[in-house]
Amino acid sequence: MEGGCSFAQNLRFGEGREASRRPPVMETLEIIDPTLSTGNDGGEWLLIHPTQRTMGFREVLLGAPAYSPGHGIYNAVRATSTVIRQVQASVLRNILDGVAFEDLADDWRAHISARGFAPGDLAEKYWLEPADAVRVAENATETWSFLLRNLLLDFVRRVAEYCIDGMGGADGTAAYARYVDWLTCLGIVPVIREGDVADDSAGKGTERFVADTEWDLSMQNRLRLAPAITRRGYDMLGCLERCFRAARVMNYDRTVVIMHSATRELRAYDVHTRERGGCVVAWDPMLTERGIVFDSPMQRLYAAVLRTQAVREHAKLCQLANTAPVSVLVARREDKVAADPAGVSKLVDKALGEGAEEAGQSAAAKLIKFIIDMQNMRKVGDVAEVVDAYLRESGGPAIDKTFSLDPGRAGFGGNGKSAQGLLGQQGQPNQPKDGVASVMRDAVNTSVGKVVNNLFKAVSDLKSANADLTRRNAHIAKELTESRRRIGALTSAAARDNSNGSSRYDAPDAWRVLDEKDARWEMGDTLLSLGNLPESVTMNKVDLSGEMTEDQYVANSFFSRYVPPYLEEESRLSALWERELLRVFKMHRVTNNQGDEVSISYSNSSISLIVGPFFHRVLKATRLGFLVADDEAYKSEEELCESLFKKSRVDAYLRDLKTTYLADVRNACAIRKIRQEPFLREPQDVSGEFERAGVGADYIDGAETAPWPGDDTRKKWDLANRGLCRGGPARQRVEWERGEDHGQLGERDVRRSVPRWWRTTPYPTREDQRSGRGRRGMRQLR
């Protein structure tokens, strides 16, 4: 078993192998079957199963990735009820057709003799009322037919049940469900045939059946038809048992199917038992440049199922992501001090006071603003303008201010005139003012130069560092892209090596969202699933800082709780499932008067397309007879047995025996009544009628004139004698007396040719003639 497991692991899609080597599946199969490496005839063996796509077919059929309402039709296709009814109908027809009419008639005669229901016995009992005898006879035939029918059907049901148990077993017998799965997925059915089963194995099965059933020797002794029925049942059981044991439909998940590209030969191998089997091809696959294309329903439905599942999972992710109560859009402007001095100026104004009065009263604000203006210079000539503006704004009042010295004050040694004279000289140029301005200009230029040099150096260093980081990031991004490309190429090569080209059709698993499918978030509790999602999906945080400039800002934000319309996709997929399965397998939709679907059933075409090849091509069962009809496939077991019994030869035999038996009972009652009725009637005086007819008394009383019984003259005499004794028509009696011939009449015809009241008179027998009783003695008896 361990070797089988390792063998199966080596066959698993060639994982971990190099793309340049041959597929590991083919290498392993060549070890088992050396003929794969010889006699290629210019072709090569291609792996068509298992691949990711073919295994996906089976998963979709089981409803693993997605399930839609139309998918349920496949359950009706896969149902085994029709196969069971086919086995039951075949066994019943085959066994009942073995009943011989002679055996059935002998059993019927033995039955009526044992019960005392022979026609003579019933006439002896019920001759006064023949209708009662007929009713008793009808009841007897119906009772015996009912008991015989139930006995036969019970035996047939046991045989069919034993055959069905053998067909549905798991130990090497063929399974109809696996057959339908292969047919739907690939259109190819791998079958392992064991050859002809030995007779001893079939005999053991028959012995087990005899031990399990109640059709014992005592029943065979009571019924003459029992041996023939038993023999037919055992033969049918042995035939079906050999068919079921000789063929085995392989399991889908442990089978390898390969095809030769030149000869299109198909071979199948069991990965556990290493057995080789053949393939029953219902629809031929096609080999193309992109791989194997199957002519099957799943080949046409697979892509649509994956698309619908992707939309469904997208909707689920959107539902989980939009479950968060708050979604925030965050954005900010980047702090670019060196690149945008105007922004720094605004920040300084905001920090020191944006009002004009506050700016004029703060010397620090004026100085910082002067430095910023120096940084914003675009050419060297702007230095003079900036300095002059700063001096006019801050230094002008201090320099232009004239110190008025009053010489008339104490300590100055002057008078008022001198003061006025001094005041009168204010309009003249002030030499100290130019000197102070020159000194301040030089000092400011020196300090501004140092500050500007430092700022420019810092900006240059930042630009260099930024360029280096940008270059390094670009190099890393390029390496990452190249690595991803190489990984994708290796993965594609490995997939092509595994499936030998067919993987180009293989789509990735639809449920592999966020790298791996996690059952915790798939359809579980909403809050728990939401917590298991990545933070990038649930936070809904959008950062636009890198995309915004000085002139851009967030004017508004819109949060869309979008959920894809997956219901439309599901409806479309459901309709696609229905159309594909109904049309491919010719299924029949049963509806009520309102047009609502009641059930999906097999039609006659479906039975011919699916059930027929299963018995004829897979099981090679040749004694099944006609296929069961669609109206019989869905009847109950009892209704099916009743319906088939009415169509069998046994029912026709029983009807024939019933008709004959009832006729015999009526005839026996009529004869018995003819013989007994004269003893119940009073004698009549008919002498006057004789005289009117002109018949002499010697004709009436002459016993010696009576002819001997047995000749035609005696028949005429009997008729005339009956007519004379019972007052029959004189004219007819005269014609008989004259000897007119009315033809040779049998006993029944004679009785029918005269009136009913003539038929009840007995005539002298041979013993009466010998004893001398004659007609006179008969009249005395009457």
UniProtKB/Swiss-Prot annotation:
Signal peptide per UniProt: none
TM spans (from-to): none
Subcellular location: Virion; Host nucleus
Keyword Transport among record annotations: no
Basic and acidic residues: compositionally biased ranges: 735-752
Coiled-coil region(s): none
GO cellular component: host cell nucleus; virion component
Entry keyword set: Disulfide bond, Host nucleus, Viral genome packaging, Viral release from host cell, Virion
Positions of region (Disordered): 735-782
InterPro entries per the UniProt record, alphabetical: Herpes_Portal
Sequence segments annotated as region (Putative leucine zipper motif): 448-469
Skewed-composition ranges (Basic residues): 772-782
NADP keyword on record: no
Protein's GO biological process: chromosome organization
Major site of localization recorded for this protein: virion
Subunit structure: Homododecamerizes. Interacts with terminase subunits TRM1 and TRM3.
Membership in a protein family: Belongs to the herpesviridae portal protein family.
Function: Forms a portal in the viral capsid through which viral DNA is translocated during DNA packaging. Assembles as a dodecamer at a single fivefold axe of the T=16 icosahedric capsid. Binds to the molecular motor that translocates the viral DNA, termed terminase.
Protein name: Portal protein
Protein source organism: Psittacid herpesvirus 1 (isolate Amazon parrot/-/97-0001/1997) (PsHV-1)
Gene name tied to this protein: UL6
